[in-house]
Amino acid sequence: MSYRSFVHSIAIASTIGLAPPAWAETPALPAAVSHQQVPDTYRFPLGKLDIVALSDGTVPQDLHQLLTHTKPAEVDDLLHRSFLDNPVEASINAFLITDGARRILVDTGSGQLFGPGYGGKLVDSLASIGTTPEDITDILITHIHTDHTGGLVVDGRRTFPNATVHVGKPDIDFFLDPSNAARTGYAQKYFDEAAKTIGVYDKAGKVKPFADRATILPGVVATIHQGHTPGSAFFNVTSEGQSIIFVGDIIHVAAVQFPKPSITIVYDQDPTKAASVRQTAFAQFAGDRQLIAAPHLPFPGVGHVRADGHGKFGWFPVEYRNRAGQ
């Protein structure tokens, strides 16, 4: 299924608040069945940094509708191997980095834009660790899709009034120019949503675009990997010889795209490049034993990639720790 035909088929509502956005877009979300959890966080150190994974919630996903360069039977087989069935549940993760001087968010979840019951839990997760929106000094946006920028606003106002938003210049140039919708065929609603989220900060002078390989904050280097969007970014964060890379939407479904990285998703602006980026990055992460964090892997979305041969990979979450001692 092509991106254009998929968008045409679902006939989404024109009102932003009713439109199912980027990663959470499905033909119809089922009536909400409660799987409510207490605010979810997972804290771990990295050198002198304190990092907290924050849950913005989860959403159900019909992979038969969303995944491309595959067939439903193949998807079902891969899911079966991981004891899963379609539809699956997708995590929406954000991350807080504290270095003593700054409180830095990586992505902001979906905010109000998925509708009641789906996402929008980031502020509650922050509150559970004693952090308010006003405490946030910087926000690193991996790419401009609503499940990463939706939490930037509440009722049209900036959720994080003191924060500077850092985002790749190619994404700014693409999504804040609505003429690109007609030129490329990418759905108009993504541009509308960008204007209502990242655009609010841009008008306030609170957006700092970055180029590839830019050091955007001390110990934070951004690299741009075109494919999912024109300005999709990784953030390599280092402290005292340790590092973690925040990888954005290089991966959506662990059970499917780790064993078969060539499988893409309808939201990829350039699916061929997105698949190539994924294959190359997975191999590098595995070879380097690199710790990574991803917004749509099962919460907390932090762990390592292992090369399993023949272009296949496996995912290994960090071990769970819950103690005060060293």
Residue ranges and their predicted role:
Residues A19-T131, D135-D138, T164, G241-G248, F316-V318, ...:
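Metallo-beta-lactamase
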Residues I139-T149, H225-S232, A293-P300:
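Histidine-centered catalytic micro-motifs
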Residues H8-L18:
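Bacterial N-terminal signal peptides
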Residues G120, E240-Q326:
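Cap/insert and terminal regions of metallo-dependent hydrolase folds
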Residues G100, P116-H166:
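Active-site metal-binding motif and surrounding structural segment of the metallo-beta-lactamase
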Residues K48, I97, D107, I136, ...:
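Divalent metal-coordination and catalytic microenvironments
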Residues D56-G57, T108-G111, I144, P170-D171, ...:
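Active-site metal-binding loops of divalent metal-dependent hydrolases
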